[in-house]
């Protein structure tokens, strides 16, 4: 914990094409070694592929996909009298978004398509159809929280 009081969160600027802060956060998650231009190109190309395949606004599709992969519950380890319990907790909205974006990018990188733009668009399209690695990760997280519901009274 910081000694000098609360540290405020740094606000991100909306991206230039879609005007969305969530897209900027996606770009930042895709970015490697500070190469933001390449990350932007990957994301915008992925959005073009989505527009081509669905015929819908890619931002709308992306928001829908994010809603499908953002977790509502997660488990946190809590030590009580020598035993460690997995205690189900609600996820804060900012953490929900961060986890959703992280899972989306991580599982995009693990896919088999040739280029990252194809992998990212594929994972987003899978997420709106309730499929794909990121959606499965959310479901697993929820199952884990449900299985440990008995320890919910250890919440803090």
Curated annotation (Swiss-Prot):
Record-given protein name: Small ribosomal subunit protein uS7
GN (gene name): rpsG
UniProt keyword list: Ribonucleoprotein, Ribosomal protein, RNA-binding, rRNA-binding, tRNA-binding
PANTHER family, sorted: RIBOSOMAL PROTEIN S7
Organism placement in taxonomy: Bacteria, Bacillati, Bacillota, Clostridia, Eubacteriales
GO cellular component labels: small ribosomal subunit
Record's function text: One of the primary rRNA binding proteins, it binds directly to 16S rRNA where it nucleates assembly of the head domain of the 30S subunit. Is located at the subunit interface close to the decoding center, probably blocks exit of the E-site tRNA.
Molecular function terms from GO: rRNA binding; structural constituent of ribosome; tRNA binding
GO biological process, one term: translation
Organism: Ruminiclostridium cellulolyticum (strain ATCC 35319 / DSM 5812 / JCM 6584 / H10) (Clostridium cellulolyticum)
InterPro entries, per the entry: Ribosomal_uS7 (IPR000235), Ribosomal_uS7_bac/org-type (IPR005717), Ribosomal_uS7_CS (IPR020606), Ribosomal_uS7_dom (IPR023798), Ribosomal_uS7_dom_sf (IPR036823)
Family membership: Belongs to the universal ribosomal protein uS7 family.
Self-association state and partner proteins as the record states: Part of the 30S ribosomal subunit. Contacts proteins S9 and S11.
Keyword Ligase: no
Coiled-coil segments on the chain, per record: none
